[in-house]
């Protein structure tokens, strides 16, 4: 099984990915996590340090693939989860998608790409070009990490569009959304009501998850010395169980930008008993013609 994890930048994809990887390993699977971000910090909480990237290793070998060994690029982290960082081109130059392709090519050369039960691609923020959608070419399922906010759901909708496009030529499905760092899910529910897709799990805002990232550990590793954290691990184990059940997945149909803006803006600008106190911006009048004009201006 190959998974690609996407979501708005800063939404907690890497932390979520690492904990899902451990959860899958706890279920007896051999797991490889591939970080697909030039920051090369995806696997930090698995290994405890920033591992060398594949691109750095290839450059050091003058791109002679035959001189690269598995131990040069694959590092085993906590829970026996193997880790790879694709790395990326210098800022403002090159293509991140090309780097992902080179990573997969090298792993195949090393006969490592097919040795795992699960390969998880942790991809940088929003899909802004076809290059960063490259991991979808290899994935069976896409997971989208979001929160209960406007920006994250807008980014999720763009990723949904990429999944739909890639599904035309690849056996790719959207496994569903993972809500992260949110005690509410009203906006998420509003979105999936109009754009049907599964919601796999919703994790509340838990300080210990943030602390785990700072410490360079997964929640599972921290729970070894603090059993009070076991309930957090259960969230990720639930996600793993659903994925291992081979979900049918969906080929979603994204909303048009204007439709999504209208849907979410109307929700934010209308106070109801359901969203009273749940959104940061609550105005006592619904979306008016003036508001619609402002929306038109935003979307120009």
UniProtKB/Swiss-Prot annotation:
ATP binds at residues 10-15, 39, 180-181. Binds 1 [4Fe-4S] cluster per dimer. One of its GO terms (molecular function) is metal ion binding. GO terms for cellular component: chloroplast. InterPro entries: NifH/chlL_CS, NifH/frxC, P-loop_NTPase, Protochlorophyllide_ATP-bd. GO terms for biological process: light-independent chlorophyll biosynthetic process; photosynthesis, dark reaction. Its EC number is 1.3.7.7. Component of the dark-operative protochlorophyllide reductase (DPOR) that uses Mg-ATP and reduced ferredoxin to reduce ring D of protochlorophyllide (Pchlide) to form chlorophyllide a (Chlide). This reaction is light-independent. The L component serves as a unique electron donor to the NB-component of the complex, and binds Mg-ATP. This is Light-independent protochlorophyllide reductase iron-sulfur ATP-binding protein. It comes from Chlorella vulgaris. The lineage of its organism: Eukaryota, Viridiplantae, Chlorophyta, core chlorophytes, Trebouxiophyceae. The gene is chlL.
